[in-house]
């Protein structure tokens, strides 16, 4: 099973994110064989030594890459089973989270003040940032429950079609421009 992390915040916030990633991955590794972590994007390489070292004893296969082309991002995301998003509350303004949804991934993420539709229509399992155990439990559930993971993936694919795909975006522009006339 493969978990994707697309982008890590820099500085102290990034350190906190990596501690949360490691904590959730260790919990999942106790229940899932051959667990893989693929981290890539902004600041990922800065935290590679920490992620590799902290997950070594948990037998997690860790690979970290830097900034990738759009095609490479799509390949990484489409090769994953779930996206873990711990960069604060998920919202439609979070491009990396939208990329995971657009690739049909289940997403485990924190909810926040800006979390709402269309994110809540996608295959996102929302947890409280204040409750660390919720993140662990959510990741384990998505990785171990094949039917649940498939349901979340289906919801992400539908959200991509309804809200985030170019035809849906174009339709929204047409409606907005028509209402101005």
Language-model segments: which ranges?
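C-terminal alpha-helical cap of glycosyltransferases
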Residues: 166-181
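Acidic donor-binding loop of glycosyltransferase active sites
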Residues: 77-92, 105
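A short, well-ordered alpha-helix in the C-terminal region of glycosyltransferases
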Residues: 141, 148-162, 175
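Conserved catalytic-core segment of nucleotide-activated headgroup transferases in glycan assembly
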Residues: 2-51
């Amino acid at each position: 099973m493969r978990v994707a992390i697309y982008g890590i915040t820099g500085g102290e916030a990034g350190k906190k994110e990596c501690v949360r990633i490691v904590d959730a991955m260790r919990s999942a590794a106790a229940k899932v064989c051959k667990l893989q972590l693929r981290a890539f994007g902004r600041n990922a390489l800065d935290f590679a030594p920490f992620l590799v070292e902290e997950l070594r004893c948990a037998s997690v296969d860790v690979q970290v890459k830097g900034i990738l082309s759009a095609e490479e991002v799509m390949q990484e995301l489409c090769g994953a089973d779930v996206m873990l998003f711990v960069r604060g509350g998920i919202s439609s303004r979070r491009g990396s989270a939208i990329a995971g949804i657009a690739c049909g991934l289940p997403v485990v993420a924190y909810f926040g003040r800006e979390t709402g539709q269309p994110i809540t229509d996608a295959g996102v399992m929302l947890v409280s940032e204040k409750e660390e155990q919720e993140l662990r439990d959510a990741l384990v559930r998505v990785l171990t429950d094949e039917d649940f993971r498939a349901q979340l993936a289906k919801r992400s694919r539908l959200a991509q079609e309804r809200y985030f795909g170019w035809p849906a975006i174009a339709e929204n522009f047409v409606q907005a421009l028509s209402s101005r006339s």
